[in-house]
């Protein structure tokens, strides 16, 4: 049993036409931030619900934009969807993007690991192999520190090492994954009753230790491919606030960024057996990190090739073409910066929708544009 929740939600928004209503109080603070000149604490019926920072200091940022951070206790309330939509719509705050999102799952232990310390031991002794990034940080009781180029370990050696925290990714990573002992955090920092109440309502046993597996998404450098529609989805409020869509989103992050395998010594680690740590087997979404340059890595080529193979089977079975899907494939390859590769590999199989020919025509148009005189040439 695990409970999926939102633990951080910051919304990039247009507040240029903001008009606070009578039910909401926007209390302006006497200070701002390094990025925004103005800061407001927002209250609804006397309850503090959000912080709005706006009025960008830099001219490079769009005028009238800001960041709306929903306070942590609000994120665990039952009618979160209505609360956020009312806050934005009633006060004329327009959604632009999600600047930071932390999704978490709380549980008592991983499947197969009633003693969570055994999970840490199996990882550190390579009995479990994590697919993907190999740099990590492990923490236990803060007494002794050990550093090397690949990880930092903080712990106390007594009768055994007791680990409380494991992180993959850095503070600047577009996606970071954290596993930590939430019960220990309550002991060390502060107990949050509203989280404990959510546990009790969802059969999370607080008499045992409760662990949290959290994924933090920052900026707009990650998109999601809907594997049913083959369409791209950016992060949006429906995806986050609707419980069903939120679970699909979390499942996608778990399958991509918490992929552990039972190490049987195979050279190809991705062929080793999955370690089923949580009862999550599939998601209709697939996360893809956007680097900002032409993306030509092997994983994305494999994804496009898999789509092409599936489409071949559909065409053979139905003896007909799907122009909508073909257009989506074209859009996908352009989005990933793989038009030339796709045209060379698959262009010949399209009779009257020749991707190779289209790519060549686009190259010729770009060449013509490059030699056209500009205002500076005249």
Predicted feature locations:
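Structured, helix-rich domain cores that form ligand/interaction pockets
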Residues: 1-292, 306, 310-378
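Helix-turn-helix DNA-binding segment
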Residues: 293-304
């Amino acid at each position: 049993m695990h409970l999926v929740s939102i633990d951080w939600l910051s919304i990039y928004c247009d507040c240029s036409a903001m008009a606070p209503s009578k039910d909401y109080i926007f209390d302006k603070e006497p200070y701002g931030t390094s990025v925004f000149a103005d800061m407001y604490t927002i209250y609804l019926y006397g309850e503090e619900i959000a912080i709005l920072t706006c009025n960008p200091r830099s001219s490079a940022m769009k005028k009238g934009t800001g960041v709306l951070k929903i306070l942590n206790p609000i994120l665990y309330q039952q009618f979160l969807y209505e609360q956020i939509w009312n806050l934005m719509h009633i006060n004329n705050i327009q959604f632009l993007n999600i600047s930071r999102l932390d999704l978490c799952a709380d549980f008592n232990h991983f499947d197969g690991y009633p003693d969570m310390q055994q999970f840490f031991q199996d990882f550190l002794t390579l009995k479990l192999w994590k697919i993907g990034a190999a740099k990590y940080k492990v923490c236990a009781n803060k007494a002794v520190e050990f550093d090397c180029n690949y990880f930092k370990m903080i712990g106390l050696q007594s009768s055994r090492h007791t680990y409380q925290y494991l992180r993959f990714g850095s503070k600047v990573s577009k996606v970071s994954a954290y596993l930590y002992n939430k019960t220990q955090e309550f002991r060390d920092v502060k107990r949050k009753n509203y989280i404990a109440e959510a546990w009790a309502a969802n059969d999370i046993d607080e008499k045992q230790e409760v662990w949290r597996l959290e994924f933090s998404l920052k900026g707009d450098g990650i998109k999601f491919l809907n594997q049913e529609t083959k369409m791209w989805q950016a992060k949006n409020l429906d995806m986050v606030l609707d419980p069903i869509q939120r679970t699909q989103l979390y499942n996608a992050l778990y399958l991509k960024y918490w992929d552990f395998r039972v190490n049987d010594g195979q050279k190809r680690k991705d062929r080793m057996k999955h370690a089923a740590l949580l009862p999550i087997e599939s998601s209709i979404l697939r996360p893809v990190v956007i680097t900002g340059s032409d993306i030509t890595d092997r994983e994305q080529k494999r994804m496009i090739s898999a789509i092409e193979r599936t489409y071949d089977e559909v065409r053979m079975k139905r003896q007909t073409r799907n122009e909508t899907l073909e257009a989506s494939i074209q859009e996908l390859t352009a989005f990933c910066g793989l038009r030339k590769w796709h045209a060379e590999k698959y262009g010949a199989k399209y009779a009257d929708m020749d991707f190779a020919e289209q790519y060549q025509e686009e190259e010729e148009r770009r060449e013509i544009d490059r030699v056209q005189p500009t205002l500076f040439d005249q």
